[in-house]
Amino acid sequence: MLDCIDINYEHLKSVASIHSTSYPEDHVSGSMTQQLIVDYYTEFLSGENFFYGCVSDSLNRELLGFVVFGKGLPDRVTKFKRNNRLSLIIFFLSHLNIFYRLIFKRLVASFQRKDNFEEAENLILSIAVKKGASGVGPFLMDAIDKCYKKNEVSKLGLYVACSNVRALNFYYKNGFKVKAFVSGQYYMEKEYE
């Protein structure tokens, strides 16, 4: 039976490991060092966001997946980039193929049509599941739904790379609809009643 826990600093090495194996290499953070990923997720341990983990049961505390969602997430990402500027520069200089791919994506995105939309106040930053862990993604999505229904949140947004077909299908199955196209990503929303 799956169980939901609040993530704390002690879980961050497991979070970084799951993140590394579940994000594709063409996603910048999918190639970051373990320590940089730990520093990234440290930003989300407090504030107006939620950071849940999924374990197989209350006795076996092995982390099978996690989700970060809530308010103020873009500001925390910006803070991480600002506070880790030197580490990020070193990372990109040692991974020039990722750096060039990022520059190319940004250049292409600057010429693409940008949809106008109003971003939801509450966003999902990340859902990641350990390889081979079955049912964890839907379990975490259910935890989000319960949290937001309890707190009377009306809508939830997220961004998904257009190339991430598996994630797009997952979010469609869970009630999300594409609202806009932004920089090679779909912005999707789910409304709660």
Q: For the regions a protein language model found, what residue spans apply to each?
A:
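A short helix-loop-beta-strand connector motif used in the catalytic cores of GNAT acetyltransferases and
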Residues: Y40-G53, K71-K79, L123
